[in-house]
Amino acid sequence: MVMKKVYWTLVAIFVAAALGGCVNDPTEMENAPDMSAGSRKILTSAEAEAGELLVKFSKESIAAVEAGVTRSESTRTGIQPFDAALKEISAVSVERVIPVVEQHEADARASGLHRWYRVRFNDQVSLDEAARKLAAVGDVEVVQYDGYVARNFTEMSAVPYNNVWSSDRDQINTRSGETPKFNDPMLNKQWHYKNTGDETLVSPIKEGCDINVEPAWEFCTGDPSIIVAVMDEGVMYKHEDLAANMWVNQAELNGQKGVDDDGNGYVDDVYGYNFAKDQGDITWTDPEDSGHGTHVAGTISAVNNNGIGVCGIAGGSGNNDGVKIMSIQTFAGRYQSTISRNVDAIYYATSMGASILQCSWGLMSGAINSDEQYLDERSIEANAFAHFINTKRPGSPLNGGIIIFAAGNEAGACGYPAAYPSVVCVTSLSTDFTPSVFTNYGMPADIAAPGGDLYYHKNHSDAGQVLSTVLKLDGMYAYMSGTSMSCPHVSGVAALGLSYAKQLGKTFEPDEFRDMVLASVNDLDPYLTGVKKHNNGTMNLVEYKGKMGSGMIDAYKMLMAVRGTPAITVEQDKPTTISLSKYYGDVTALSCMLEVSDAVKDKLGLTFTVEGNNATITCSKQSAGLVTVKSSVGGTSMSREVAIICRAKAASNGGWL
């Protein structure tokens, strides 16, 4: 007999910033509660959805369930003990959590999502009692309570761009003589893309604390075949700086209102689907809508080089070549999705071709304290994640998907689902490489990215947040901060990497690509010393060492990893000696030389000398470029390109990839 599990799910969004003083290692999680078979119990169902339970049937019984539900018009399953329990709780329906769609059914069955059913019954019946009755049936593997996905965006209010900068303010944050890559007028305020250390923008600030995307744009700016599903508030698909990069379901756009024109199980899903309201229309004007999803979307793929607004990391070059944003709406004003609807949302994103699931939401720090507890309490969600990651999409350069989560904003342990190993957990950095005051951190953290830091800066404090697209109410462009804002930087870089892979005709496995993302970083440890003072206290930065993830995401390194080009990071103004012969494995008797174009020399301020097979390189400017290592052995000439990246500080091993 399969052991039964009965769990309660209560989801809380973690966007409020925690601003207290330092505590003793808040990332050390307490021991998880005893969930062994002998002591497992039903947790409180006080906040769960009344009259509803989620049931996962065994592999052996699912065929009978499917046949029974079809015959009985969704009121009985054909499994006598289960049907008897349904009668006792006055069940009114038994339906599959995800829709039955012929073209995607094989994938649903491969992941096991087809075995999850939603049971609805008289809401006057005790949830706990109903759960016990259903769990007692031998053909049931799991009974899980459903619950609404709560949110709290009140601490994340957008600060309109025009409240920070007057419309006639001179451009700043641009080196003398430099021409921006694109003509978007607010790009120079997006320090998180290119940070020149200009203290007229905000202070404190350090040059190079950015995602290094400008040199990456020389190779790739995006690709419309790459789809990023933004699981959040609705994305304002009419926004002037987003409309051209919105994913569009052409069958529904050109179809009949109220009809599922493409037969995918969802009606009128033109730009995605509104799972909060269970409708095709994506909304953003309800009371309590904050523009959160629209801000996240802009960081990933605001349209580049269109002469307005801001830039997106993978927003293209102004030639309809940016990655596409699919709006997976799970919050709409006072409406929230349930955990089962979220599973449906993830299934939808998978089926409709999204390769990246962008998730700036999750549980509060400490709500779940271990992977075991997470799997016990939210197994249906973990099942949906596995489905997204492992399902192949036709024509995609990624043979599956990647899921990217915000770590949370309580200045404590990384929250779940972000801390779950199969997803990427993103922490937040300020303008000077220090952890944001609010960021969660700890061993589950995978990678760091700019997320801003409202309570830290001395002048123009709002400009130390992340600038992106928002709703008309906030002037279309505004600043926000949080791990909600750092997370889409990683999603954007991942999307840029997949775009470049598409351009080069390369494909990657999900684990392989995830490893490439996590390796495409700059070291943070040199900055994690001493004490950081902020408006509400101090932070001992040593406590964050090894707990912010692998490092700060670097878009240029990501593209070099996709390209297959080795990259080395050199420290600004510090001579660095590299062995040129190492690029040719065990070949001996080599004669090597280094070839550098004038353009790369100028961009990096690069000078070098070669002695034997060793080159000593010095760079005076923070940027990146390709050089060529040439060699000969016998009468054969060989060449190999190498990427040189100059940053303010570098890891002791030179940052080899």
Task: Name each region found by the language model.
Residues 103-118, 132-227, 235-241, 245, ...:
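Protease zymogen maturation seam
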Residues 17-43, 647-657:
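Bacterial Sec-dependent N-terminal signal peptides
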Residues 354-361, 400-401, 501-591, 655-657:
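C-terminal subdomain of the subtilisin-like protease fold in secreted/lumenal serine endopeptidases
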Residues 216, 231-238, 251-264, 285-290, ...:
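Flexible, small-residue-rich helix->loop connector segments that border functional cores
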Residues 138-141, 206-279, 295-299, 303, ...:
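Acidic-leg catalytic submotif of subtilisin-like serine proteases
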Residues 23-26, 218, 222-224, 233, ...:
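Substrate-binding/access-modulating region of protease and related hydrolase catalytic domains
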Residues 297-300, 326-332, 355, 359, ...:
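Hydrolase catalytic cores
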Residues 29-167:
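Inhibitory N-terminal propeptides of secreted protease zymogens
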